[in-house]
Amino acid sequence: MKISVAVSGASGYAGGEVLRLLANHPQVQIGAITAHSNAGSRLGELQPHLYSLADRLLEENSVANLAGHDVVFLALPHGASGEIAAQLPAETLVIDAGADHRLVYAGAWQEFYHSEHAGTWPYGLPELPIAHGRRQREELRTTKRIAVPGCYPTSALLALAPGFAAGALLADDVVIVSASGTSGAGKAAKTNLLGSEVIGSMAPYGVGGVHRHTPEIEQGLSSVAGEQVTVSFTPTLAPMSRGILTTATAKVAPQLLKETSAAQLRQIWVDAYEDEEFIHVLPEGQWPATQSVLGSNHVGIQVALDERTGRVIVCSVIDNLTKGTAGAAVQSMNIALGLEENLGLKQLGVAP
């Protein structure tokens, strides 16, 4: 018997990407597809690329329509998913692609999101190292509630986590700059996302430690490092529809810097990800490009040592809608249900 799945928020980019992946999942039967303001519309009017689901009608975004499924994906703005999730049955696997359940500390949530904290769920980044040589996927095997990471934190955490897990990096001097495609800002019409504003131009935003993903990045790195990690994070809007390129740098521990070559430092990342199907530390001299991961759940990483400054430089690329959102959601679902982790996620990147 197939697994019945409902998707809430199906008219947006994240919800549409969840449906795209589920449409190719061999163990899934797509049930209710819901939306808020677009309820009653044909899915094909809003997600024209989803041909096999085009004639499905979007139902009202209500608990009544979502309950009764084995799995519910919530692809909703922050604040909305927490309210619905609290009313869903405990036996339903609920996967929140929004921000509501990512942060551990209520104070951090209130500071950056300016609303009441909905609580914390297990973090849906399976490859993230946790205590005693384990991975976050162990936390996902026995849960019915999963918080999908933000797209920027996904690229940043996967870039730096191996170094912090190995005790190779200092916690007080971490700088992360990420360039993202416009789909990361959602579907709502905004002047700064118009083609005439974006094409041929790049611009930073959320500068000065105010971007909402900053505490999530610090939370993830701190949990890996076992101490408080402070991050300077700057996001940049790039003239592309999807993809994230992150350049993350951190000071290497002085004693390690004296005793370790650049090749040995890089090997920390190679060893950390050698058994991970979706994460690829590229051959030396090959730098990751967003094009290579578009539409896929894969991650490209390269590591270098700046010997002059004593900093490690890690570049990572993801598709913000796939590994950065929907791919992580489906991957986490597979783990929680005891399925093969790569089901519905075997697509390779699209190039050129």
UniProtKB/Swiss-Prot annotation:
**Record field: catalytic activity:** N-acetyl-L-glutamate 5-semialdehyde + phosphate + NADP(+) = N-acetyl-L-glutamyl 5-phosphate + NADPH + H(+)
Residues annotated as catalytic: 151
Q: MF terms per GO, please?
A: N-acetyl-gamma-glutamyl-phosphate reductase activity; NAD binding; NADP+ binding
Query: Which locations, inside or outside the cell, does it occupy?
Result: Cytoplasm
Q: Which UniProt keywords are listed? A: Amino-acid biosynthesis, Arginine biosynthesis, Cytoplasm, NADP, Oxidoreductase
Pathway named in the protein's UniProt entry: Amino-acid biosynthesis; L-arginine biosynthesis; N(2)-acetyl-L-ornithine from L-glutamate: step 3/4
Specify where it is mainly localized: cytoplasm
Top-level EC class: oxidoreductase
Return the EC number: 1.2.1.38
Give GO BP annotations, semicolon-separated.
Answer: L-arginine biosynthetic process
* Any one cellular-component term (Gene Ontology): cytoplasm
- InterPro entries (alphabetical): AGPR_AS, AGPR_type-1, NAD(P)-bd_dom_sf, NAGSA_dehydrogenase, Semialdehyde_DH_NAD-bd
**What job does the chain carry out?**
Catalyzes the NADPH-dependent reduction of N-acetyl-5-glutamyl phosphate to yield N-acetyl-L-glutamate 5-semialdehyde.
Could you say which protein family the record assigns here?
Belongs to the NAGSA dehydrogenase family. Type 1 subfamily.
Protein name, per record = N-acetyl-gamma-glutamyl-phosphate reductase
